Amino acid sequence: MDDLIKLERNVRSTYATTLSLLASRFHYHLPISDRDVPGSPRVLFLGNHSSGKSSFINHLAGAEIQQSGLAPTDDGFTLITYGEVEESMDGQTVVTHPDLDYHDMADLGPEFLAKLQYKAYPAENLRHLTLIDSPGMIDSASGSQLRGYDFRECVRRFAESADLILFFFDPDKPGTTGEAISIFTEQLVGLDHKVLIILNKVDLCDHIRDFARTYGTLCWNLSKTIPTKDTPRIYTTYIPDLATGEPDQKNTIPLSLIHI
């Protein structure tokens, strides 16, 4: 992977010193984008607030990197990747940093940059991987007005450059919020091949009938939102360290059969 990064930098250097001059001379504009010379794989986390996105990231990294809670804990995007030492940057630094490929995010506005964060952490599971945590979606399609920046446009921009998009739901909120409907029907159009739908926190379902009811509700809501003939596959998961189920209780879900 280090050789790939060096090759990427050489390509960008050649473009800047040679190809860009030719493009300027012949009045031809074709800048390199992140998708032209890809770096480490990117995973975008979307979902309703308190659906377990940040907790899942912490579990994956094996460290408490993101703050998590029942109430919305953040209103901006967070870029999380590997670093030899723990480090954080604000949004303005991220889009102007010469070694980071987020320069094109600068045009999303100062309000977006004020809430954008970059976190590097020495967790081996993050090596050669970038995770993008997003604010929890709310029951209003006009969330951009509440956040102060164009949330939907930011989602689209990150989704286009992401290699995988994980969309989280949980048993407490198996329905689709106003923002979720907007994201599915507008911002993720043409990108559905990247999306995996996750029903998280299934350990909160005390009985198998509770799980069936929750799963069915989510399927029904998604069928009215996603314009496809068949309901997309829904993956179920939970975080073992946070599990609340009691395996010896009658009719409880056999959590040992659920794979993360």
Predicted regions and their residues:
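Conserved G1/Walker A P-loop phosphate-binding module
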Residues: 1-130
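Conserved small/polar residues in nucleotide/adenosyl-binding loops
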Residues: 258-260
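Conserved active-site aspartate in kinases
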Residues: 133
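Conserved nucleotide-binding/hydrolysis micro-motifs of P-loop NTPases
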Residues: 85-87, 136-138, 172-174, 201-205, ...
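Eukaryotic scaffolding regions of large macromolecular assemblies
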Residues: 242, 248-256
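Conserved C-terminal guanine-recognition region of P-loop GTPase G domains, centered on the G4
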Residues: 109-130, 146-229
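Flexible beta-alpha connector loops of hexameric P-loop NTPases
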Residues: 138-147
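Beta-strand cores of modular interaction/reader domains in eukaryotic scaffold and signaling proteins
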Residues: 42-44, 78-81, 130, 167-168, ...
